[in-house]
Amino acid sequence: MKEYQTITEISGPLVFVETDEPVGYDDIVEIELSDGETRRGQVLESASDYVAIQVFEGTEGIDRDASVRFLGETMKMPVTEDLLGRVMDGTGQPIDGGPEIVPDERRDIVGEAINPFSREYPEEFIQTGVSAIDGMNTLVRGQKLPIFSASGLPHNDLALQIARQATVPEEEDGEDDEGSEFAVIFGAMGITAEEANEFMDDFERTGALERSVVFMNLADDPAVERTITPRLALTTAEYLAFEKDYHVLVILTDMTNYCEALREIGAAREEVPGRRGYPGYMYTDLAQLYERAGRIEGREGSVTQLPILTMPGDDDTHPIPDLTGYITEGQIYIDRDLNSQGIQPPINVLPSLSRLMDDGIGEGLTRADHADVKDQIFAAYAEGEDLRDLVNIVGREALSELDNKYLDFADRFEEEFVDQGTDTARSIDETLELGWDLLSMLPKDALNRIDEDLIEEHYREDETAETVEA
């Protein structure tokens, strides 16, 4: 450990120190102020004669007489199964007043991408209890499926709903008591104090905290801390998944705040900016986070990611959602129009996509009719959406009887299937049965994407009769 008192410049969250020998990139630093206070930081840039340090607690009050100690190691997360039920700040320090954490080991937070040769293809279903996801855009264990939202939309409510409702089928059915434990890692970045209180109230009220580890980085915390929080969360998830055989769902919100922190740090370092001022390495940086999801051959556990981001200006071509879409395996869209109609959660299934869905559904996974029901609902709802535009021109009276049924289907799909509130958890059977109720509004010959045997087994004749009477 070497100590310096050679601070040359303090700029925003950065402290620049003259050194007489090279210092390792990402090394942890302690800065001792004249009043004895100690702050932690991390080496952000290292040259032969100086280093740039990002200070986690902020640089206010630091002067040139402060002592800087380089600890010679990168940041590590103390991990143990006892982290479940605990609440940490954005740097991994407990803030819940609980006992001191006694770690089983300390792990480097940067982590490593899973060796492609050792990856197992994601195939098992995760039940979120949300019909628009489970039925139409299924989440699969080991997948990374982002939620694209926008300012003012209830993505936090959806995140909390998934955190308390998510299960794996084998855990729910009790078929396999070993290797099927389910845990949630919740990493919040740049949230307000009000949002933090809302999160904690919900976790404690519903009992979801018992199977969760929560990391909270607040809006008034230093931006550099936001770059640490998701790595702490993922390091904890990897330990629980690959050492303790948990199926871990990692919810990260809001990745836009994370990227804004990257931009702020890049500006402080006077880096050459990329698109819209974001650093040119943002794609690589995001990939380092998202690629930590997956399954490893020979291990029971899995890491599944559900990152949430708000699209600036509702623009899905903005660099943050654009780059996220390249790396991840689909997206769930939160829709402003559906939200204005009072539909909760306001998920628009048409632009949403789960690229791994087809491998995680079907007989032995969800139900044999799942894929056909999903395809037919997509087709019918898309037809109803197109007809809504036509109705604005010619009116409903000019449409055929079948066209009017498609319009009614689209309305009921939003009101009954998508709109389930934030406190209702539906099983996959309930979701698919509701899908059949809606599809039975249409005549059998319109169900051209479903196997005839499945139609005979599940079609409700009474639904068609009720529609005709109406």
Swiss-Prot record:
Assembly and binders: Has multiple subunits with at least A(3), B(3), C, D, E, F, H, I and proteolipid K(x).
Organism of provenance: Haloarcula marismortui (strain ATCC 43049 / DSM 3752 / JCM 8966 / VKM B-1809) (Halobacterium marismortui)
Lineage top rank: taxon: Archaea
Keywords: ATP synthesis, Cell membrane, Hydrogen ion transport, Ion transport, Membrane, Transport
UniProt protein name: A-type ATP synthase subunit B
Described function: Component of the A-type ATP synthase that produces ATP from ADP in the presence of a proton gradient across the membrane. The B chain is a regulatory subunit.
Location of this chain's protein in the cell: Cell membrane
Primary localisation category: membrane
